[in-house]
Amino acid sequence: MNENSSGAPIVRARGLRKEYGSGSGLVRAVDDVDLDVAQGEALAIMGPSGCGKSTLLHLLGGLDRPSAGEIWLEGRQIDKLSERGLAQFRRHDVGFVFQAFHLMDELTAQENVELPALLGGRSPREARRRARQLLDQVGLSDRAGYLPSALSGGQRQRVAIARALANDPQIVLADEPTGNLDSAATLEVLRLFDGLRTAGLTFIVVTHDERIAATANRMISMRDGVFVDEMRLTGGSKRNLANCAGLGG
């Protein structure tokens, strides 16, 4: 599906396929998918467990290689990059947010956010400055020195979002980012996503929850490795954010 009303897409995939196994055991987790995503767009890809949405996200983010097809980010063909090139791509161009947070337990919130900036080549001083700026942006400047074990689920996910932004990525990919959160924490995180999208950052979120998908600009339904439906959403993100968390409108 190739809907794009904002000029050249920042993400483009053509004929994207991911296969596992062989012969009678061959499974196509992603089956000849085409996708365009515009700059500043919030796209939700939804579907049941096992439909291929997380596999697709991993392909778009360079965490896995496709069996066939092409992936482009701002005119650069990602699927042809070397392993070293893919590592650089993941480090500088993409921010990842996962359901399980994946924070380092022995590091403070600030140190978790600093780490990708340091790995990306920033000086310790610049990494600290960037981490403080991002923790303030996600409303956790007063929790900078806390270990993840001392933070709530919503706070840990906000740290993870700050970490994803440490190297100013072109796009953020989120895999069930609110799956482990209660309603209040879900609303908290989705409001943050909405603010970042409004500021021009591009998001792709995969989810099985229609309420979460309804907070995006566009929603694609996926089943058995293929796109089966697409909808442009115009209902207003603030109302959708409140409704998705069950907190009223």
Predicted regions and their residues:
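ABC-family P-loop ATPase nucleotide-binding domain
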Residues: 1-19, 232-249
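ABC family nucleotide-binding domain
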Residues: 9-227
